[in-house]
Amino acid sequence: MQTLGHHYHALVIGSHGAIGRALLEAITADPNCALATGLSRATHAGFELTDEASMAQAAESLKADAPFDLIIDATGALTIDGHGPEKTLGALDAAKLQRSFEINAIGPALLIKHFAPLLAKERSLYAKLSARVGSISDNHKGGWYGYRASKAALNMFLQTAAIEIQRKRPQAVVVALQPGTVASSLSGPFAGGHDVITPEVSTEGLLQTLDATEAKPGAQFLDYRGQTITW
C-alpha cells in the first residue's frame, strides 16, 4: 500500500476466514504497515456479528491501536446454519432470511457504527467485502434471494454511512468490494461455472484496488480487478 504513507495502521475484521486471513497476512508483510491487527472470534473471545455489545467491547479494546488508516470487514456468509441460498420463491423462509440479513447486512452495519470512529482523520479506507450478486441492476439470473437481498441492503448501508463519515473525514474512502469467486468453504459448493481464484490472488487485487481508489462522495462498488460494479 503506497497511498496510506509509511507506518500506517490496519485492522482486518473477520481475519479467521480464508480471505480475511490472506488479507491480514499480506498487510502484515507490507513494509509500509506499522501495525496490522486481526479481529475475529479467535482473537477476541465472545466476538459475534449478532451481538452488538461484543462489537462495542472489541472496538473499545482496540482504541489503543487507533487511529486506523485501513479497516477491512471481511465477514459474511453464503451458507448459514447449514442452509444454502434459495433458488425459488417457494424456498423462502422467514427465519432463514432473517439470519442472512443478520450476518450479511445488520452485523456489518453495526461494525461500521462502532469502528468507523476509529478511522484516521486524513486519508483512510473503510472497505467491506460485498458481492456482485448484491447489484440490483446486474441481476439477470434471479435466485439466491436472501443472499442477494442482504448484500443489496449492505450496499445501501455502506452508501449511507459513507455520506455521514465523509462529513467529518472528507478524505475517507468507503468501498464495497467484490473479491471474485475465491476458493473457500463459502464458495466451494457454488463455484461451478465461475473462474475460481485463490485467496492470495483475490487479496493482491483487492489491496491494489484499494491503494488506487481516490476519495469520492459516497461509497464505491469495485471488484478485485478495480472495475466499477453498478449498484
Q: Where on the chain are the PLM-derived regions?
A:
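Rossmann-fold cofactor-recognition segment
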Residues: 39-57, 62
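N-terminal Rossmann NAD(P)H-binding glycine-rich loop of SDR-like oxidoreductase domains
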Residues: 13-29
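A glycine-rich helix->loop->beta "capping" turn
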Residues: 61-75, 80
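Hydrophobic positions on the long internal alpha-helix
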Residues: 111-115, 119, 157-158
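Conserved active-site helix of classical SDR/Rossmann-fold NAD(P)-dependent CH-OH oxidoreductases
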Residues: 25, 109, 152-163, 200-207
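Catalytic loop of short-chain dehydrogenase/reductase
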Residues: 77-81, 85-101, 123-159, 163-168
